[in-house]
Amino acid sequence: MAKVSQSIIKALEEEQMKQDLPEFAPGDTVVVNVKVKEGNRERLQAFEGVVIRVRNRGLHSAFTVRKVSNGEGVERTFQTHSPLVDSIKVKRRGAVRRAKLYYLRERSGKSARIREKLS
């Protein structure tokens, strides 16, 4: 019985997953368009920054984007397959040697730069 219910849950999760997502990795600069509801109207808000973390868990996948706004570091975590995430666009590929770029939190200016991946 457990295997049957697991397969049903897996089928339902795969049905809800988005198929049109670009491949991105930590170090990439992305623009995430998020649906924001203000009162009775809905608009798109763009959030551009460096991906510092990717969590691959099927339907529960998430990624964290960091940007510096007015001298203040802002991090936002998005659920990859959320209906609130309208689109993800990769602007620049970054060459990094780590899966989690938490060290960028302590850095600013030139030391926080990421080399561009040459491919």
Swiss-Prot record:
Entry's transmembrane regions: none
Gene Ontology molecular function terms on file: structural constituent of ribosome
Gene3D superfamilies reported in the protein's UniProt record: 2.30.30.790
One annotated GO biological process: translation
Entries under SUPFAM superfamilies matching the protein: Translation proteins SH3-like domain
Annotated GO CC locations: cytosolic large ribosomal subunit
Tree of life domain: Bacteria
Keywords of the record: Ribonucleoprotein, Ribosomal protein
General function of this protein: This protein is located at the 30S-50S ribosomal subunit interface and may play a role in the structure and function of the aminoacyl-tRNA binding site.
InterPro entries associated with the record: Ribosomal_bL19, Ribosomal_bL19_CS, Ribosomal_bL19_sf, Translation_prot_SH3-like_sf
Keyword 4Fe-4S attached: no
Coiled coil (UniProt feature): none
Family: Belongs to the bacterial ribosomal protein bL19 family.
Name the UniProt record assigns to this protein: Large ribosomal subunit protein bL19
